């Protein structure tokens, strides 16, 4: 039986192997109804800040969208004091999350 620390390290390694779009879905699932802005996703996932916005745009505009703007229209301020859209998963996004190999 694995120690909890080993299990969390294994899970983190699996998340890092996901595509960027699937990492967005994974982290939005964790954040639930609170959601996340593009800036928050950059802080969580790391990498190039210009790579997250195209992923959330693609995921929200797909024929079956996996993410959507927060249903209450919630926005949060970023480091530059600008309002940012808060993204949450759609029901299809939750279903897709279940197929990810991180659980």
Locate each region found by the language model.
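Short alpha-helical segments that sit at the start of domains
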Residues: 1-27
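Short glycine/proline-centered loop/turn elements that form peptide/ligand docking sites
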Residues: 17-18, 34-36, 53
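Short amphipathic alpha-helical segments
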Residues: 22-26, 39, 53
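Surface-exposed alpha-helical segments enriched in charged/polar residues
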Residues: 26-29, 57
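Short helix-capping/hinge SLiMs at alpha-helix to coil transitions
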Residues: 28-34, 48
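Short acidic, hydrophobic short linear motifs in intrinsically disordered regions
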Residues: 33-44
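Short amphipathic alpha-helical interaction segments
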Residues: 46-61, 67-72
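Short, cationic-aromatic polyanion-contact patches
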Residues: 71-100
